[in-house]
Amino acid sequence: LGVKIKVLGAAGEVGRSGFLVNCDGTNLLLDYGVMFSKKRNDPPLYLLHVKPKDVDAAVITHAHLDHSGCVPSLFNGGNTSVYCTSPTLDLSMLLIEDMLKIEKNKHSFHNGHVNSMLRN
């Protein structure tokens, strides 16, 4: 039984939480968040990139954008199963859709990817 954990973000910083846990060839993504830049016009700061096809499942611990804000990118060329509570999913969707409205064209995903997240 071999377990490897790759820290994608949140190490030495507040925000963009993400951990890729590999156990015997299965990849579980624990959170996949975003961190907003200090300057309003700068793009948000993303985690180390994970290819959607390399993720078997994702778990969102809670709805804050620093834990859920990048999850829709898993549906940009992929179709990952996402696990979380119903309230976490509902609030995550609301926050991510609001983020996309406010920060037009700054993200690698759009509302279609957010809707795919809902169906999974």
List each language-model region with its residue ranges.
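Extreme N-terminal starter segment of soluble prokaryotic enzymes
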Residues: 1-6, 27
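Short Gly/Pro-enriched turn/cap motifs at secondary-structure boundaries
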Residues: 9-11
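Pre-active-site segment of Zn-dependent metallo-hydrolases
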Residues: 14-16, 23-60, 64-80, 95-120
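Short internal beta-strands
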Residues: 80-89
